[in-house]
Amino acid sequence: MASAITQCSTSELTCSICTDYLTDPVTICCGHRFCSPCLCLLWEDTLTPNCCPVCREISQQMYFKRIIFAEKQVIPTRESVPCQLSSSAMLICRRHQEIKNLICETDRSLLCFLCSQSPRHATHKHYMTREADEYYRKKLLIQMKSIWKKKQKNQRNLNRETNIIGTWEVFINLRSMMISAEYPKVCQYLREEEQKHVESLAREGRIIFQQLKRSQTRMAKMGILLREMYEKLKEMSCKADVNLPQDLGDVMKRNEFLRLAMPQPVNPQLSAWTITGVSERLNFFRVYITLDRKICSNHKLLFEDLRHLQCSLDDTDMSCNPTSTQYTSSWGAQILSSGKHYWEVDVKDSCNWVIGLCREAWTKRNDMRLDSEGIFLLLCLKVDDHFSLFSTSPLLPHYIPRPQGWLGVFLDYECGIVSFVNVAQSSLICSFLSRIFYFPLRPFICHGSK
């Protein structure tokens, strides 16, 4: 009966991937257990959806439950199995002819009992070799988890910058079109300024693009180094226990070097170029927008889209709470169906806001979303200390500084243009170009909590 119990516990505490006793055990949705390092490396190398290596059941998420009780079972099981130690593991003290079965915490040297009582080591803390093995093994697991988190963060940054690189040239070309469309409205003498602006934008775009490419290369190399370090730690955790104290010091130094060398993602932000006379020209079409308090539309779907977009910008390991930011919306009292109109909104005290124009019919509906038709909006969302700007139709990020005072909104109904300007900088934020308005428009303002 005792052998049956031993056989049962041994099979339960064996990893099906490495066929060894479980290290930092976890269980997935189907109930099978594996070493956390083995499962992490296996799932990262698999391009198909994450599935159990035993029963092939697909796991819906990467998060697994840690088995707290398993660690207590693995330790005595390891002790009950004869250790195949190298000859150096059973060293005999030359001076006292006794087995070195203690480890000094200070210099991590093997000692016999009499050596541990010598003046050199008497004030130091000592562990039995088996206790020290488990102590250093836990330290290794902590280092492995730290390395894996760094690798995951590096991979997220790499994916984000790869996506930016894929659309960067399109964004630069589109922004050049926006800027070029602004200048024909002003006098001929501004042509020279336009040319300088576009050339500087192209030059700045090339510089940031190269920064992104270099950062992408650094992150890719760091991912390889972190993977190698993680595999080395995994290999060390399976070595003869007596080698752990001597090797851990070098590993800790290398891990600290990798921590200091972790590449930081590039913040691809272009300069805000002043356009001469833009504020004066727009002020010719200034109107004063009042809010219609009688419109009580509740755009829950739009607010939900904003929260999820805000969460997608957060690269922390902690899950984002989509209800953390509360939004309230307001509609302008004026209905605009012709002519040129310009007004300004103070966003100085707002971190999260949505401002622009929407089709008048949306005032009577509650199903407006960020991808709905007939909305021309500029969004500002804050995550930690970073602000991101987006425009709708379609949703597009803008890598330029956010306005920190007054935001200007300009509508040219007949030409199908909606523009947003940074009043303090007299610079263009973005424009909706060559649209056809066949419906009335209303100003729309939405503010979110800080």
UniProtKB/Swiss-Prot annotation:
<keyword id="KW-0862">Zinc</keyword>
<dbReference type="GO" id="GO:0061630">
    <property type="term" value="F:ubiquitin protein ligase activity"/>
</dbReference>
<keyword id="KW-0863">Zinc-finger</keyword>
<dbReference type="Pfam" id="PF00622">
    <property type="entry name" value="SPRY"/>
</dbReference>
<feature type="zinc finger region" description="RING-type">
    <location>
        <begin position="15"/>
        <end position="56"/>
    </location>
</feature>
<dbReference type="InterPro" id="IPR000315">
    <property type="entry name" value="Znf_B-box"/>
</dbReference>
<dbReference type="InterPro" id="IPR001841">
    <property type="entry name" value="Znf_RING"/>
</dbReference>
<dbReference type="InterPro" id="IPR013083">
    <property type="entry name" value="Znf_RING/FYVE/PHD"/>
</dbReference>
<dbReference type="InterPro" id="IPR013320">
    <property type="entry name" value="ConA-like_dom_sf"/>
</dbReference>
<feature type="binding site">
    <location>
        <position position="96"/>
    </location>
    <ligand>
        <name>Zn(2+)</name>
    </ligand>
</feature>
<dbReference type="InterPro" id="IPR017907">
    <property type="entry name" value="Znf_RING_CS"/>
</dbReference>
<dbReference type="GO" id="GO:0008270">
    <property type="term" value="F:zinc ion binding"/>
</dbReference>
<dbReference type="InterPro" id="IPR001870">
    <property type="entry name" value="B30.2/SPRY"/>
</dbReference>
<feature type="zinc finger region" description="B box-type">
    <location>
        <begin position="88"/>
        <end position="131"/>
    </location>
</feature>
<dbReference type="GO" id="GO:0005737">
    <property type="term" value="C:cytoplasm"/>
</dbReference>
<dbReference type="GO" id="GO:0010468">
    <property type="term" value="P:regulation of gene expression"/>
</dbReference>
<dbReference type="GO" id="GO:0045087">
    <property type="term" value="P:innate immune response"/>
</dbReference>
<feature type="domain" description="B30.2/SPRY">
    <location>
        <begin position="269"/>
        <end position="450"/>
    </location>
</feature>
<feature type="binding site">
    <location>
        <position position="121"/>
    </location>
    <ligand>
        <name>Zn(2+)</name>
    </ligand>
</feature>
<protein>
    <recommendedName>
        <fullName>Tripartite motif-containing protein 77</fullName>
    </recommendedName>
</protein>
<dbReference type="InterPro" id="IPR043136">
    <property type="entry name" value="B30.2/SPRY_sf"/>
</dbReference>
<feature type="binding site">
    <location>
        <position position="115"/>
    </location>
    <ligand>
        <name>Zn(2+)</name>
    </ligand>
</feature>
<dbReference type="InterPro" id="IPR018957">
    <property type="entry name" value="Znf_C3HC4_RING-type"/>
</dbReference>
<comment type="similarity">
    <text>Belongs to the TRIM/RBCC family.</text>
</comment>
<dbReference type="Pfam" id="PF00097">
    <property type="entry name" value="zf-C3HC4"/>
</dbReference>
<dbReference type="InterPro" id="IPR050143">
    <property type="entry name" value="TRIM/RBCC"/>
</dbReference>
<feature type="binding site">
    <location>
        <position position="93"/>
    </location>
    <ligand>
        <name>Zn(2+)</name>
    </ligand>
</feature>
<keyword id="KW-0479">Metal-binding</keyword>
<dbReference type="InterPro" id="IPR003879">
    <property type="entry name" value="Butyrophylin_SPRY"/>
</dbReference>
<dbReference type="InterPro" id="IPR003877">
    <property type="entry name" value="SPRY_dom"/>
</dbReference>
